[in-house]
């Protein structure tokens, strides 16, 4: 329902390739120090690329007393600097970089942890580490046991740890819910991009690192408009860019919704042939991945549910021929309002479901516009069939205007209760209130937190981190 921006036109720029995500234990307090202080610091390399890497910093308090403040000091080799930090205060002097707790994580109770992280510019890894003045590598040779360079255990082998894809595996529909590879209901939460024809420059290595490692998202929705200077103007260019973005998200362990963003015209049949061509190639290329979901019609409008259903039953087989077991999300009547915006509701879908398996139905809402009747429709639908909220905002349906966080919290609570996945609109610096970043943030390369965030950005980041 959100509108296109009044400015910012143009074709997608070339993407920067990224490497697969890595994990590396940089520093751990030595056993002797741990017995004396009981405070450990672990730095884990989460992802790397040609000119840098991102890392998380975890401080653990294994004492019987509360730690009121912590300080981690890392020494980086010449040519490597800290470009961005989250959940910590950062100062530097020469090659020494000091990270201290902020208001919400400086105090650590017994048995508790505090997490932060940074993005390094340059490939050099820490050569020395201290936690509250005690050397992290005391008693260990650099690169030896417990010292810098020691690989950490594979996160995927530890229940509840690792990237979202490592935790949940290939998701599937089970009954009325989305489940992990073991059949346990799971809620995936994350962000939707804006149209990549306008805001592709907001999707960079550093912004996606922030989304994955600082914001703690599980999933990203890649929104590719078909009209409005979108796919129809350059099918090859937009398809190639979607391949790149899928790979970039995959490298960070994120799930991906490939969003065929129809809006105007609202009849999905208008773009049927284009959809078949696009999804045939996307499914063929990415069928072996465990993290890709397909959203085949963003916001159908002005057409009946029967028409939307017939469209879905033509596109789904194209995907299934190439990718037989990934989740497919079908847009619903009335701008994916489950029909509410056009005087209907979930019952029409339940009475005439799409003839396909492992599918879900999309619901979109904008909290300042869509009140209790929409909330009740979501509640009703979640009892009838699988629903994924692939787009929502705290503002009005225009993507702009005042935020209604109180109403948005009611939706968030229901979605948490029913384990309904969601992606918020939108991860860009559009001038409208629905965009999470202040205008100019993307062109400046961040930062992707703090003063760069609008109110809606602060709100959703806190939801994802909780």
UniProtKB/Swiss-Prot annotation:
Class in the EC hierarchy, top level: hydrolase
Biological or metabolic pathway of the protein: Glycan metabolism; cellulose degradation
SMART domains: CBD_II (SM00637)
Entries under InterPro entries matching the protein: CBD2 (IPR001919), CBM2/CBM3_carb-bd_dom_sf (IPR008965), CBM2_carb-bd_dom_sf (IPR012291), Glyco_hydro_5 (IPR001547), Glyco_hydro_5_CS (IPR018087), Glycoside_hydrolase_SF (IPR017853)
A matching Pfam family: Cellulase
Signal peptide location: 1-36
UniProt-annotated catalytic positions: 299, 391
EC code(s) of this entry: 3.2.1.4
Keyword Signal carried by entry: yes
Cross-referenced Gene3D superfamilies: 2.60.40.290, Glycosidases (3.20.20.80)
Residue numbers spanned by region Disordered: 129-166
A GO term for molecular function: cellulase activity
GO BP annotation list: cellulose catabolic process
UniProtKB keywords: Carbohydrate metabolism, Cellulose degradation, Glycosidase, Hydrolase, Polysaccharide degradation, Signal
Family, similarity comment: Belongs to the glycosyl hydrolase 5 (cellulase A) family.
Annotated protein name in UniProt: Endoglucanase E-5
Record gene name: celE
């Amino acid at each position: 329902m959100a509108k296109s921006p009044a400015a910012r036109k143009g074709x997608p720029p070339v993407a920067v390739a990224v490497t697969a995500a890595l994990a590396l234990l940089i520093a751990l307090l030595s056993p002797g120090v741990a017995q004396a202080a009981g405070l450990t610091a672990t730095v884990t390399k989460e992802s790397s690329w040609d000119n840098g890497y991102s890392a998380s910093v975890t401080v653990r308090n294994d004492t019987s007393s509360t730690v009121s403040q912590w300080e981690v000091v890392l020494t980086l080799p010449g040519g490597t600097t800290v470009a961005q930090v989250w959940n910590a205060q950062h100062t530097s002097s020469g090659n020494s970089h000091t990270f201290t707790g902020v208001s919400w994580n400086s105090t650590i109770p017994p048995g508790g942890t505090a997490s932060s992280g940074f993005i390094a510019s340059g490939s050099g890894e820490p050569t020395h580490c201290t936690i509250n003045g005690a050397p992290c590598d005391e008693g260990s040779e650099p690169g030896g046991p417990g010292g810098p360079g020691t690989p950490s255990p594979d996160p995927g082998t530890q229940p509840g740890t690792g990237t979202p894809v490592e935790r949940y595996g290939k998701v599937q529909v089970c009954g009325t819910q989305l489940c992990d590879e073991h059949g346990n209901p799971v809620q995936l939460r994350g962000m939707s991009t804006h149209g990549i024809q306008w805001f592709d420059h907001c999707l960079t290595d550093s912004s996606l690192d922030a989304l994955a490692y600082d914001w703690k998202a599980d999933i990203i929705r890649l929104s590719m408009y078909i009209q409005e200077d979108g796919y129809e103007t350059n099918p090859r260019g937009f398809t190639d860019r979607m391949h790149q973005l899928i790979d970039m998200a995959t490298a960070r362990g994120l799930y991906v919704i490939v969003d065929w963003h129809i809006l105007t015209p609202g009849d999905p049949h208008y773009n049927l042939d284009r959809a078949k061509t696009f999804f045939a190639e996307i499914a063929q290329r990415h069928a072996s991945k465990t993290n890709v979901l397909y959203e085949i019609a963003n916001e159908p409008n002005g057409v009946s549910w029967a028409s939307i259903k017939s469209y879905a039953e033509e596109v789904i087989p194209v995907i299934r021929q190439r990718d037989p077991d990934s989740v497919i999300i079908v847009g619903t009547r009335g701008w994916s309002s489950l029909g509410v915006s056009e005087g209907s509701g979930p019952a029409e879908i339940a009475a005439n479901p799409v003839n396909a398996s492992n599918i879900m139905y999309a619901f979109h809402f904008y909290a300042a516009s869509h009140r209790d009747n929409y909330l009740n429709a979501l509640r009703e639908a979640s009892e009838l069939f699988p629903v994924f909220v692939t787009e929502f905002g705290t503002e009005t349906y225009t993507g702009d205007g005042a935020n209604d966080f109180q109403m948005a919290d009611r939706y968030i609570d229901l979605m948490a209760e029913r384990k309904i996945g969601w992606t918020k609109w939108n991860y860009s610096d559009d001038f409208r209130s629905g965009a999470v970043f202040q205008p100019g943030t993307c062109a400046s390369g961040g930062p992707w937190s703090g003063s760069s965030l609008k109110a809606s950005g602060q709100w959703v980041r806190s939801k994802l981190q909780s």
